[in-house]
Amino acid sequence: MCFRPASSPGSIARATPRTVAMRLLLTGGAGFIGSHVATLLATTYPRYHVVVVDKLDYCSSKKNLERIISLPNVTFVKGDVRSFDLVTYVLNSEKIDVVMHFAAQSHVDNSFGNSYEFTRNNFEGTHALLEACRRATETKIKTFLHVSTDEVYGENLNDSNTEHESLLTPTNPYAATKAGAEMLVMAYGRSYELPFIITRGNNVYGPNQYPEKAIPKFAILASRGEKIAIHGDGLATRSYMHVDDAARAFDVVLHAGETSQIYNIGSREERTVLSVARDVCGILGKNPEDTVAHVEDRAFNDRRYFIDSTKLLALGWRQRVDWTRGLRETVEWFTTRDLKAYWKNFESALLPHPRFRADEDEEDAREPM
């Protein structure tokens, strides 16, 4: 079931509320992209009720939700999507009819050093959530929007990847777990008629992003006069999208997207990692030659990802935030905030090759019986 936005000729399609309010479960909503989407939906559609479930992992923060946490149409639940009992309770008690599944471990470097944690969170977590949706007794899920990544396509040196013509050939443990999770979603759609939509997005940047990712890490290090570590030669290219544009894309897909479809959420702004570092240095008045240092590359570093977003554009979405403005505002955000108010232990993320490992005392999530 899809909920279509109204649009006028020449305008950017924007979703409009249904007559009957939507009740959404947004997993991973205290993380980077999830928190921006939760904020957009809760403030744009006050008749919608947004339930955020987040286990507040190292890269999440309730402070990311400070604009909406006290709103009457927002409920926050601290919990792990791997907990079948918890998710089932939330689905039934809140009468959820739409699920937006953002919860995931997403840092490629970490996946090389701690790959099983990615399997537990990204694959097993998705399976538990799907099974809870299938077994919910007090509600019926009308849309399960699964958030995936362009990395499931694998390296692409030439053409852009399209949703239904490109094979999934993931090249790192993170991408493999996301590809596996997609297969589960599709299987539940086919086997149990669960209405689903899958999105595959490219690199997103902006405020509230945990500093293990390149742009916030570069901004913090350069502002301190420290070296920016570049993996390998730095000539791998990535496409970058500001989080405001990404959040609007999810809004449009939620309301205008067709079920059983996949939508790429991609930017045309393609840059090498080295050029990104130089742009950050330029904003901060630093000499790149003195600031950038090349270090050992990842175990495998895809040279290029590029995706075709024609289907998303057909829904009316357009990219609004250009690279120059978006990067400058992002660098300013990370260099003028008390970052420890968001993430107490973020300093370890600034290492050239960070490795996060889950706490030994993490409570095991109960599995469905």
Predicted feature residues:
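C-terminal substrate-binding subdomain of Rossmann-fold SDR/epimerase-dehydratase oxidoreductases
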Residues: 79, 222-369
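A glycine/serine/threonine-rich, flexible loop-to-helix segment
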Residues: 68, 159, 211-219
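Hydrophobic alpha-helix immediately C-terminal to the catalytic Tyr-X-X-X-Lys motif of short-chain
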Residues: 180, 184, 188, 218, ...
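The catalytic Tyr-centered alpha-helix of NAD(P)H-dependent dehydrogenases
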Residues: 166, 170-177, 207, 211-215, ...
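A short, amphipathic alpha-helix embedded in the catalytic core of nucleotide-handling enzymes
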Residues: 41, 188, 217-222, 249-253
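N-terminal Rossmann-like NAD(P)+-binding domain of SDR-like oxidoreductases, especially those catalyzing
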Residues: 2-4, 12-204, 329, 337-346, ...
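Residues in well-ordered alpha-helical elements
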Residues: 84-85, 97, 109, 116, ...
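Short, cationic motifs built from Arg/Lys/His that form the positively charged side of catalytic pockets
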Residues: 178, 200, 208, 238, ...
